[in-house]
Regions:
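Alpha-helical membrane insertion/targeting regions
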Residues: 1-214
Length: 214
């Protein structure tokens, strides 16, 4: 295993651990209820929230493993069926998230941030499925990267929130939450697009023959 492959695996492992951790916590919340979270918005549909959190949790649990090359190569059937689970979870989670986005107590700026996340998340995921079904695996890879970048917004959201709370001595100002509603996913998508743009060069380099020894 080369240093580069070790580095790539390490990056994937960090992403997978964070995703599984957040996804597992989401399912724990779904199973135990949300009363201990102190939700104060009476207009928020608790079932819409439950569906969003549960489905998004499933997407987080299985999403990172769709990019695990040994799984794709050695267990393609497992890869395919966990992919179907991922697509279903993202679709349900995104639709449920879109329905509750504007009930946030942080106002319409945060609401639009969460709503547009759902607007992009669902079609990106369905386009990943459609490209796989027509065996256009290059397009499938691109759309899956975009989809998972948005799925990973659940992780980045939970990275930004405690940072904002610590910086504000235990409080979370509404302005900070409004910013986080966008920061949780827009930078992820930008990074995904930059990575997608680099894929042809990375694949050419990987396919190039090794230099002859001196």
């Amino acid at each position: 295993m080369t240093a580069k492959s070790v580095g790539n695996f390490s990056i994937w492992l960090v992403i997978a651990v964070l995703s599984v951790g957040v996804g597992g916590y989401a399912l724990y919340l779904t199973a135990t209820g949300f009363e201990h979270l102190g939700l104060r918005n009476p207009m928020l549909d608790p079932w819409g929230l439950r569906v969003h959190i549960a489905a998004s949790g499933v997407a987080m649990l299985v999403g990172a493993f769709q990019f695990f090359k040994p799984l794709r190569q050695k267990a393609p059937t497992v890869h395919r069926w966990t992919g179907y689970i991922y697509v279903a979870a993202c679709t349900v989670g995104g639709l449920a998230g879109g329905t509750i986005a504007f009930f946030t107590t942080a106002g319409p700026i945060a609401g639009w941030g969460f709503f547009l996340l759902a607007v992009f998340w669902v079609p990106f995921t369905l386009l990943a499925l459609a490209s796989a079904l027509r065996k256009d695996f290059a397009a499938h890879e691109r759309w899956m990267i975009r989809s998972f970048a948005l799925t990973f917004g659940a992780v980045t959201l939970r990275i930004y929130l405690p940072i904002a709370i610590i910086q504000n001595h235990g409080d979370l100002p509404l302005d900070a939450y409004r910013a986080i509603a966008w920061l949780a996913w827009v930078p992820n998508l930008i990074v995904a697009e930059l990575f997608i743009a680099s894929l042809p060069r990375l694949k050419r380099r990987k396919a190039a023959p090794a230099p002859a020894g001196v």
